[in-house]
Amino acid sequence: MNITELMELFSNPETIKTLETGDLMTGIGVTVVLGMGITVVALIFLMYIIGGMAAIMAEKPKEVKETAAAAPKPEAAAAPAPAANNDEELVAVIAAAVAAQLGTSASNLIIRNVTRSLDTTPAWGRAGIVDQMATRL
């Protein structure tokens, strides 16, 4: 029995029961290989489509044209004066938040140093934290 006839017999559930063990195992193997083969080919096809789309959508480096007249170099800007004022406000806000958390007055606290810590939480983690704070508290 060739594979085409065997697959025709596999299309009817009643005829599967009449097959010999060897033919049944051959049909099962052909079905599995055919199914996996089609899946692998489809995934490879999708891989190439996605790769092509990524190549099309990728930003191309912009070419900078040199002009004959050199643009004047910007001078270094002076540091803004209100920065010290913002630091004092930041310390006041942090002191108020800590005092509120501890249930005491801000005048009872002594803040010696305020340093920024690096946030290594991924974007999805920050989104989860915001979601929990918004919906569960």
From Swiss-Prot:
Subcellular location as annotated: Cell membrane
Keywords in alphabetical order: Cell membrane, Ion transport, Membrane, Sodium, Sodium transport, Translocase, Transmembrane, Transmembrane helix, Transport
GO CC, one annotated term: plasma membrane
Membrane topology per record: Single-pass membrane protein
Sequence intervals crossing the membrane: 30-50
Superkingdom field: Bacteria
Cited Pfam families: OAD_gamma
UniProt cross-references to InterPro entries, sorted A to Z: Na_pump_deCOase
Catalytic activity: (S)-methylmalonyl-CoA + Na(+)(in) + H(+)(out) = propanoyl-CoA + Na(+)(out) + CO2
Record flagged with keyword Transmembrane: yes
BP GO terms, sorted: sodium ion export across plasma membrane
Listed EC numbers: 7.2.4.3
GO molecular function: decarboxylation-driven active transmembrane transporter activity; sodium ion transmembrane transporter activity
Subunit structure: The methylmalonyl-CoA decarboxylase is composed of four subunits: the carboxyltransferase alpha subunit (MmdA), the tunnel beta subunit (MmdB), the biotin-containing gamma subunit (MmdC) and the delta subunit (MmdD).
Family: Belongs to the OadG family.
Record's function text: Subunit of the sodium ion pump methylmalonyl-CoA decarboxylase, which converts the chemical energy of a decarboxylation reaction into an electrochemical gradient of Na(+) ions across the cytoplasmic membrane, thereby creating a sodium ion motive force that is used for ATP synthesis. The delta subunit is required for catalytic activity as well as for the proper assembly of the individual subunits to an enzyme complex.
Protein name: Methylmalonyl-CoA decarboxylase subunit delta
Organism taxonomic ancestry: Bacteria, Fusobacteriati, Fusobacteriota, Fusobacteriia, Fusobacteriales
